[in-house]
Regions:
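Extracellular ligand-binding/catalytic regions of CAZymes and related secreted enzymes
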Residues: 221-224, 405-439, 479, 558, ...
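Noncatalytic N-terminal accessory/assembly modules of large enzymes
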Residues: 2-59, 63-99
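The substrate-binding groove and active-site-proximal loops of carbohydrate-active enzymes
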Residues: 6-12, 29-35, 171-191, 274-291, ...
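A short, well-structured beta->alpha microelement
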Residues: 8-21, 35-39, 310-319, 475-499
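Polysaccharide-binding and catalytic clefts of secreted carbohydrate-active enzymes
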Residues: 70-328, 346, 432
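Hydrophobic targeting/anchoring helices
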Residues: 44, 64-65, 197-198, 208-215, ...
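A glycine-rich, often tryptophan-bearing local segment used as a flexible ligand/cofactor-contacting loop or short
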Residues: 518-594, 599-601
């Protein structure tokens, strides 16, 4: 396709028909879409552009939901903790929850599907010792054990879809009926939804792509009594439940279900929790069942000669695109929201679809497009951040969403996006059909493995958290780095003795006893001996934060012999420490003038006698290196994402794999500028990741070099 047109999707609405045609021409868009709160204008049916229709599988049909209240979508909720000070204790279930969003499910057998837990002992309270008062909404525990803490785990119907509620609150929608979420997995609703899909296809013959949003369960998102976000887990499964589903689960696994398998002491099995066997069984079951039902809908779409696209987000729980079941669904495309490089890799790395599309920011909503707002700034940051990842794992299309009329009020924004669209088309034409040059094979090791590829240290989609940004920086840096990146689990190591032979460097990043670091997996002799053998024979190991950390047999850092450091937790105060000398002239630090931003870092890390400390701060080690046999270990206390830190990580990978001599290969001496080579296509590019001009020396694949001046954000293409 010619370079000035195509590969771009834009939103439209009834009140911007002429303007839509103008933007189509200006941005070179070849696809049009509707959005939540908009309608597709009939006047645009025959523009020659592909037409996307957003199709919500689980909402936008309140008439059905109200007529079938037993098949409204449900979620598990745990009450707050309550301490018993008397023989009887009342726990109000809806405390600190938005009353219009949730409705307690007392229709099904609460003795089976609810659970009262003594959190002081961890024991389940017998059903004979608690009752539910429907009028007050209280669970009464009697008799209690005084000064023990109690919680109630219960089912609630989702009476206001969380995504619809979020959109309504952000956009201040008035007099709009809250959309009820219904459960497509249940028999009556499934039959209704299949027929409804056919009716939609019958009446929308002009639509080319059905953009499913999504299949079929919302990630965990709960609002408090003030309509503020109370709990969010973009990967959360707690809103994918119902007695109907759980009975099927029981039949498959052969043991009775407990609410605690979902509630998990109130942590809701978030991605920092080491998953239990029962929760893994539940996820396996959900993946199979969701994929099976999604395939039925996709098959119907194909029967009508249209494409089926999935939006990766919202009601997407159970789809798991990096797991084996996903390919069986037969989707044509996946579209995802681009928050940064890692969120782009969440869908650009998906196999088994014809194309992937990135919905870029800003979304055309009034929270960005208001008088005094600066949408160009957000657009620049979004594009330049995501571009690193696209250059490693290209998407095939880009797009935008929201209210087009808002964007039109900012001419400089319209002009900038025109440039982005043009740049993307050039980029894609140059790198399509090839794999970029990768200097090393890097594996991120945690409890989740490939299922959470690129989702490590992500709580909500691309949202900053003080407690994890120093770890997420590693993942973001990897998203645009010239490495062949994989994500492996401890079970992968147990099940495949040869797995590590195809890896150059292992990275383990996170806090002790989390799923990211690994916890008790590090006292499994199969795991720890396999990793030690890998490093001893020449592999690299980079540990960030509290890697391989679990108190066991006189150690907290179980790989202290590789990493060369240990954490002082009071148990080693009696042992004197004399190794505090820094060596800031190390290969890893050559581009950073000896200074590194460790973010939150870690306190109380000390070095063992054989270790080379690179940086310590007030006798707390922040970075250290050590040899172990033919291999090497690198310890880093934290590494927030920045261009400088990305270079530090790059050098750490090379050093740990004893590959310092490979530095000057497709390389820029200025860490603000990066080089990506596409040998099969005979092309390479040099990209300025900053908003200022940059000067650098570029090294090509043969080691030859040249000086280069680059404008802000510029990308230059060359023939090899």
């Amino acid at each position: 396709m010619e370079q000035n047109k195509g590969r771009v999707t834009i939103p439209t609405d009834l009140d911007v028909v002429p303007q839509t045609l103008e933007i189509m021409d200006e941005w070179g868009a070849d696809a049009l879409r509707d959005c939540d709160g908009t309608e597709f204008p009939q006047e645009l049916k025959n523009t020659g552009a592909k037409v996307y229709a957003t199709y919500c599988t689980t909402r936008k049909d309140n008439e059905w939901a109200k007529a079938n209240p037993d098949e409204v979508q449900q979620m598990y909720i745990m009450s707050s903790f309550h301490t018993a000070t008397e023989d009887s204790l009342k726990i109000h279930l809806m405390d600190h929850l938005y009353p219009a969003m949730l409705k307690v499910n007392d229709r099904d057998d609460i003795r089976k599907w609810w659970e009262v837990t003594d959190r002081t002992t961890g024991e389940v309270v017998p059903v004979s010792e608690w009752t539910y008062e429907k009028e007050s909404g209280d669970v009464v525990v009697h008799p209690t054990k005084r000064f023990h803490e109690y919680t109630v785990s219960f089912l609630a119907y989702i009476m206001w879809d969380p995504v619809n509620m979020y959109n309504a609150v952000v956009n201040d929608w008035k007099d709009v009926e809250p959309q009820i979420t219904f459960d497509v997995r249940q028999p009556k609703t499934k039959a209704h939804c299949m027929e409804k899909l056919r009716q939609f296809l019958d009446t929308h013959e002009y639509v080319d792509v059905i953009r499913f949003t999504t299949f079929f369960h919302q990630f965990t998102l709960i609002f408090d009594e003030l309509a503020r976000e109370k709990y969010v887990d973009w990967f959360g499964y707690s809103a994918s439940v119902s007695p109907y589903i759980l009975q099927q689960f029981e039949q498959e696994v052969g043991y009775p279900f407990r609410p605690e398998y979902i509630i998990d002491q109130g942590y809701m099995n978030n991605t920092y929790r080491i998953p239990s066997k029962e929760f893994e069984d539940f996820q396996d079951f959900q993946r199979r069942e969701v994929a099976k039902l999604a395939k039925e809908m996709v098959d119907i779409v194909h029967e009508y000669g249209k494409e089926a696209m999935m939006f990766m987000g919202d009601h997407w729980i159970g789809m798991e695109p990096f797991m084996d079941e996903f390919a069986s669904i037969g989707l044509d495309a996946v579209v995802g929201s681009v928050g940064n490089g890692a969120t782009l890799r969440l869908f650009s790395d998906i196999k088994g679809v014809k194309y992937t599309e990135g919905r870029f920011l800003p979304y055309f909503f009034p929270d960005t497009f208001y008088e005094g707002g600066d949408p160009v700034k957000e657009a620049k940051e979004n594009w330049v951040t995501a571009r690193r990842a696209i250059l490693r794992s290209p998407i095939q299309r880009i797009g935008y969403g929201g209210y087009l009329k808002l964007a039109l009020q900012f001419p400089d924004f319209v002009e900038y996006i025109k440039d982005v669209c043009r740049e993307f088309r050039t980029l894609y034409d140059n790198i399509r059909g090839t794999t970029p040059y990768c200097v090393k094979r890097v594996a991120v090791l945690n409890c989740w493995g490939k299922m959470r590829s690129w989702g490590n240290h992500m709580v909500h989609h691309a949202i900053y958290y003080k407690q994890n940004y120093s770890y997420f920086g590693i993942i973001e840096a990897l998203s645009g780095a010239p490495f062949d990146v994989s994500f492996i689990s401890f079970d992968d190591i147990r099940n495949n003795p040869n797995l590590l032979k195809d890896i150059d460097v292992i990275i383990n990043v996170g806090d002790a006893d989390t799923a990211q670091s690994g916890g008790e997996n590090w006292i499994d002799e199969t795991v720890i001996t396999a990793v030690k053998e890998f490093v001893y024979n020449g592999g690299g190991f980079i540990g960030v934060g509290e890697p391989a950390a679990h108190q066991w047999q006189g150690k907290f850092f179980q790989l202290d012999d590789i990493l060369g450091v240990e954490e002082e937790r009071g148990f080693n105060l009696n042992t004197d420490k004399y190794n505090w000398e820094e060596h800031r002239d190390h290969f890893i630090l050559e581009d950073s003038e000896g200074e590194v931003d460790f973010g939150e870092g870690k306190k109380n890390i000390f070095a063992l006698p054989e270790t080379e400390i690179l940086i310590q701060n007030h006798q707390e080690v922040q970075m250290a290196v050590k040899n172990f046999g033919k291999g090497r270990g690198v310890y880093i206390s934290g590494l927030p994402y920045s261009f400088k830190n990305s270079r530090v990580l790059y050098r750490a990978v090379l050093w740990s794999s004893s590959a310092e001599d490979q530095l000057h290969c497709w390389y820029s001496t200025n860490y603000n500028v990066e080089v990506h080579a596409y040998v099969k296509n005979g092309k390479y590019c040099v990209v300025n990741n900053t908003y200022e001009p940059q000067d650098t020396i570029v090294y090509k694949g043969d080691g030859s070099s040249f000086e280069l001046h680059m404008d802000a954000n510029e990308i230059k293409w060359y023939q090899i």
